[in-house]
Amino acid sequence: MASSLLTSSGMIPTTGSTVVGRSVLPFQSSLHSLRLTHSYKNPALFISCCSSVSKNAATSSTDLKPAVERWPEYLPNKLPDENYVRVFDTTLRDGEQAPGGSLTPPQKLEIARQLAKLRVDIMEVGFPGSSEEELETVKTIAKTVGNEVDEETGYVPVICAIARSKHRDIEAAWEAVKYAKRPRILIFTSTSDIHMKYKLKKTQEEVIEMAVSSIRFAKSLGFNDIQLGCEDGGRSDKDFLCKILGEAIKADVTVVNVADTVGINMPHEYAELVTYLKANTPGIDDVVFSVHCHNDLGLATANSIAGIRAGARQVEVTINGIGERSGNASLEEVVMALKCRGAYVINGVYTRIDTRQIMATSKMVQEYTGLYVQAHKPIVGANCFVHESGIHQDGILKNRSTYEILSPEDIGIVKSQNSGLVLGKLSGRHAVKDRLKELGYELDDEKLNAVFSLFRDLTKNKKRITDADMKALVTSSDGISLEKSNGANGLKSNGYIPVLQVSSNV
C-alpha cells in the first residue's frame, strides 16, 4: 500500500503522525487591526497561516508542531466555540454514489480508519436501510472505528448513518450505529416544491409531519444525536424551510442541514439562504447549522465557504469531491481554504483536521474507487506543486512562497526545494543550472550556455526533460542526435522511447 501512495515529481505523502493541530490560527482581522481570540503558547504558530504544522527534518530545521490539544467535549447541538467548524465527511455514503465508485466492505473499513487519522468530526458511513450487507458494514465500522478513542487527545469520531423518513430505515440505522460511542442518524426529506409534488407526492404539511414523526421515532430508539436534512433545500421556499426546521427543533433535532442537492445555487444566493434561515427560524441557535453542496456548476466549494461565512458551523464534504453527477464539495479544498483564509476573511473560523493526512487519504480513495483526480485538481492534483514556466521556476528557486500559497508538507507531502520543477520548453537558464547542480554538475558560464543551447534544441522534440537527458547533455561535447518524437514523454507513434545518442571526440 505504501508504494502506491507515491506521487509524481518526487513527492511522497507522510504517514503515521498523531499530533493534532488546528487547521488555522483562530483569530479575527480587519483592514486596520488584528485581534487574537485565543492564546497560544507557541509563537512559531504565527509565522504563517499557511505554513505547515510540522516541517520535515529534510526540508527544515524548524519544528512547528503545536502542543497536543485534548479534543473538546462533544455536545451534539453545541460547539466548543463560535468559530469552530465541524467537518462532516460523507465519502463513504454520498461519495460512494459516484458512478463507478462503489467500495467493498473491507475498503470502506480501511477508508474509515484513514478518515479517523484525518480527524474528521463526523463520518457518514452508509445507508443501512438499503441492504443487509450495507447494514453489516456500517455496524462493523461503528464497533471498531467508532470505539477507537485516541488516548492522547480523546478524539473519537461520530459515526452517522443516513435514513429516509421511514421507520424501517430508522430502525436499520439504529441497529447499525448503536455500537459506536457517538452514534448519529441523518434523516432526510425533500422540501422543494418539485420534489414534494413529483417525488413524494405530499403536501408541505404532510412532509412536516413525516419529518417530526421520524425524529420522535429515532429518539424513542435511543438516538440523542439527530440531524434533519432538507433535500433540494437550494430550490425550496425559504419560509417553508423556516417552518419545517422550526418544527424539527421543537422535536429535539440537534443538527439541521439545507442541501444544494442539484448544485444550482450561486455563492451569494446560498449565503443569503443561510442568513435568512438563521434569522427567521425559531430556536435555530439551539442546533448546529450544516451546509451540503453539490458541484454541478463547479461551485460546491465556493458555496460551502459562503455558507460558513453566513454562519453555518458544520460542512459536509467528500474526499476528492466525489459524489453523484459532478460530485460534492471537496474536503481538501474546503479545509485548506479555511486554513489559509479563514482567519483573515471569515472571522477566524477553523477546523481540527490533521491536514498532513490529506494526500494519503486522497490517494487511498482514488485507488479504491478507481476515480482518479485530474492533474490540476486543487490541493491533491499531481501538478499542484509543479512548475514549468521559467519565470515561475526562477521565483520558486528564490523563495517558494513567490508562486505557492500552500506548503506541500501541510498536506502530507515531503519534497525537496526543487523537486516540483519540471524541465521543458518554458524552463529558463536558472532552472537548468539549478537542476544540474542538484545532479552534481558545477558548470562555468561558457559550459552552461552550451548545455542550455542543447537543452533548448531538445525541448523542441521532447516535452519533459529527464535527469538522464540532463546528464547526457553535460557529457556531450559534439552535440546530440535525437530521433524525431512526439507525445508528452517523447513517444514515437510505435511506442518506442528515443534514447539520446551521444558522440564524443577523444
Curated annotation (Swiss-Prot):
Catalyzes only the first methionine chain elongation cycle. The lineage of its organism: Eukaryota, Viridiplantae, Streptophyta, Embryophyta, Tracheophyta. The N-terminal part of the protein controls substrate specificity. It is found in: Plastid, Chloroplast. PANTHER family: HOMOCITRATE SYNTHASE-RELATED, METHYLTHIOALKYLMALATE SYNTHASE 1, CHLOROPLASTIC-RELATED. Its EC number is 2.3.3.17. SUPFAM superfamilies: Aldolase (SSF51569). The gene encoding this protein is not present in cv. Aa-0, cv. Ag-0, cv. Columbia, cv. Ema-1, cv. Gy-0, cv. Mt-0 and cv. Pla-0. It holds the Pfam family HMGL-like. Signal peptide: none annotated. Residues 1-49 form a transit peptide. PROSITE patterns: AIPM_HOMOCIT_SYNTH_1, AIPM_HOMOCIT_SYNTH_2, PYR_CT. Belongs to the alpha-IPM synthase/homocitrate synthase family. Changing residue 485 to L: In strain: cv. Ka-0, cv. Lip-0, cv. No-0, cv. Sei-0, cv. Tsu-0 and cv. Wl-0. Coiled coil: none annotated. InterPro entries: 2-IPM_HCS-like, AIPM/Hcit_synth_CS, Aldolase_TIM, LeuA/HCS_post-cat, PYR_CT. Residues 85-359 form the Pyruvate carboxyltransferase domain. This is Methylthioalkylmalate synthase 2, chloroplastic. It comes from Arabidopsis thaliana. Keywords: Chloroplast, Plastid, Transferase, Transit peptide. GO terms for biological process: biosynthetic process; carboxylic acid metabolic process. NCBIfam families: PRK00915.1-3 (NF002086). The gene is MAM2. One of its GO terms (cellular component) is chloroplast.
